[in-house]
Curated annotation (Swiss-Prot):
Assembly, per entry: Homodimer. Interacts with FtsZ.
UniProt xrefs under InterPro entries: Cell_div_SepF, Cell_div_SepF/SepF-rel, SepF-like_sf
Taxonomy, superkingdom: Bacteria
Name under which the protein is recorded: Cell division protein SepF
Transmembrane segments: none
GO cellular component entries: cytoplasm
This protein's UniProt keywords: Cell cycle, Cell division, Cytoplasm, Septation
Function: Cell division protein that is part of the divisome complex and is recruited early to the Z-ring. Probably stimulates Z-ring formation, perhaps through the cross-linking of FtsZ protofilaments. Its function overlaps with FtsA.
GO biological process: division septum assembly; FtsZ-dependent cytokinesis
Family stated for the protein in its record: Belongs to the SepF family.
Region (Disordered): 21-40
Source species of the chain: Frankia casuarinae (strain DSM 45818 / CECT 9043 / HFP020203 / CcI3)
Amino acid sequence: MGLGRRAMVYLGLAEEDEDYLDDDYDDGRAVGRDDRRAMHEPVPMDRTVRRIDAREEPVAMPRRPPVEPLRPAGPVPMRRVAAVEESHPYRITTLQPRSYNEARQIGEEFRDGTPVIMNLTDMDDADAKRLVDFAAGLIFGLRGDLEKVTNKVFLLSPHNVEVTETDKRRIREGGFYNQS
């Protein structure tokens, strides 16, 4: 019997051919149709039914001590990592790249923990898009933040530095220059 035929029989789409049942395993004795059924008839099981009296006590399961958690449930307070407050001065680097080749400088400044203003106004649109994609990957990899300040001007903030609203407003107004 072929593979397709066996699959159809298995799925119940075709009847099993009785000619093929024992062809491969001929042991010399003739087996009739009734003998095959007798070989596969289910054996009746002896089942006894016992009624349970309502007066009988259920079997008690052994009690286990209550489970105690290893650590307390609920949120664990964590402090922010080196968050910069308004009283602490920080410097923001402004970079105005002219080609995609200057992406390395942006990455190094950002990696060192310095917020970077990326001014892409002097770049063509294709290179500017590549640089924004680079910055997005940089932000994702180092868990920073990317904000669009104006058209083609972006602020990249490291995860441990929070740029104040005052500084963001000054950047939008265009009066924020390199503070090195």
